[in-house]
Amino acid sequence: MMENVFDYEDIQLIPAKCIVNSRSECDTTVTLGKHKFKLPVVPANMQTIIDERIATYLAENNYFYIMHRFQPEKRISFIRDMQSRGLIASISVGVKEDEYEFVQQLAAEQLTPEYITIDIAHGHSNAVINMIQHIKKHLPESFVIAGNVGTPEAVRELENAGADATKVGIGPGKVCITKIKTGFGTGGWQLAALRWCAKAASKPIIADGGIRTHGDVAKSIRFGATMVMIGSLFAGHEESPGETIERDGKLYKEYFGSASEFQKGEKKNVEGKKMFVEHKGSLEDTLIEMEQDLQSSISYAGGTKLDAIRTVDYVVVKNSIFNGDKVY
């Protein structure tokens, strides 16, 4: 059993002496594999978060993205399309039999996506290990992200199998009900799980799920994440896929989990739910605000780059921030 678990709202980072005159001097860029990105943040590879249009926008503006895998037949044309424009191609695959054929087809057509994310709910499995090895054999140049996991053993096994990065988080997301349906996961202690996994990792970790505020991005970096995957904060923008509805004069957009019946079209092994999130305006505005908030975080950390956040002190305060303040 693990003692002293904590989650995002239980932690406050402690400021160090500021060395910049303006937060605009702080650099939020991060390198993952061979590419450098503007923010250590990636929108979740979910159907109500990303589509081709958003992927293109993100890639053109130097943000990392991962395309979802729920229209598998479109992936080849997507890779071609992105690469023909000089943009990176970053796709997701599952672990079923036809995904093995898909990887071989890419190799046969000499299509090498820059990033491939193997993305299943319980990533500590032979199925994922075999797929990592398969991709590394046929597409050795692709950067492989594997997940999702929640333990140091899993991180080490996937790294040893050849994963270039691992994705940590089992069920902490807002539209994920894994914790309720199964009793398992990192919901409620995602930040402690991230820290535990990061200590075992020798390659980058992507924290996935449970982010509710921009400050949580800084906290993720502090506890070892290279990149932070975010769903709900990216849901509900003008550009977001998904239907807009009006209720009592307010606009909302649908947001659903990848293992929900809305996603699957059937009620089998459902571990996701649907919710409506308030319409948030433009994606660009949110990305700019995230960058500015992270620049402020770096200045509070007493540095000019993201790495400064990794060494700050912190305190564990149960639910400090929420003493009556509604932040979302």
From Swiss-Prot:
<dbReference type="Pfam" id="PF00478">
    <property type="entry name" value="IMPDH"/>
</dbReference>
<keyword id="KW-0560">Oxidoreductase</keyword>
<dbReference type="InterPro" id="IPR001093">
    <property type="entry name" value="IMP_DH_GMPRt"/>
</dbReference>
<dbReference type="InterPro" id="IPR015875">
    <property type="entry name" value="IMP_DH/GMP_Rdtase_CS"/>
</dbReference>
<dbReference type="GO" id="GO:0006163">
    <property type="term" value="P:purine nucleotide metabolic process"/>
</dbReference>
<feature type="active site" description="Thioimidate intermediate">
    <location>
        <position position="176"/>
    </location>
</feature>
<dbReference type="InterPro" id="IPR013785">
    <property type="entry name" value="Aldolase_TIM"/>
</dbReference>
<dbReference type="InterPro" id="IPR001295">
    <property type="entry name" value="Dihydroorotate_DH_CS"/>
</dbReference>
<dbReference type="GO" id="GO:0003920">
    <property type="term" value="F:GMP reductase activity"/>
</dbReference>
<protein>
    <recommendedName>
        <fullName>GMP reductase</fullName>
        <ecNumber>1.7.1.7</ecNumber>
    </recommendedName>
</protein>
<dbReference type="GO" id="GO:0006207">
    <property type="term" value="P:'de novo' pyrimidine nucleobase biosynthetic process"/>
</dbReference>
<comment type="similarity">
    <text>Belongs to the IMPDH/GMPR family. GuaC type 2 subfamily.</text>
</comment>
<feature type="binding site">
    <location>
        <begin position="205"/>
        <end position="228"/>
    </location>
    <ligand>
        <name>NADP(+)</name>
    </ligand>
</feature>
<keyword id="KW-0521">NADP</keyword>
<dbReference type="InterPro" id="IPR005994">
    <property type="entry name" value="GuaC_type_2"/>
</dbReference>
<dbReference type="GO" id="GO:1902560">
    <property type="term" value="C:GMP reductase complex"/>
</dbReference>
<dbReference type="InterPro" id="IPR050139">
    <property type="entry name" value="GMP_reductase"/>
</dbReference>
<dbReference type="GO" id="GO:0016627">
    <property type="term" value="F:oxidoreductase activity, acting on the CH-CH group of donors"/>
</dbReference>
<comment type="function">
    <text>Catalyzes the irreversible NADPH-dependent deamination of GMP to IMP. It functions in the conversion of nucleobase, nucleoside and nucleotide derivatives of G to A nucleotides, and in maintaining the intracellular balance of A and G nucleotides.</text>
</comment>
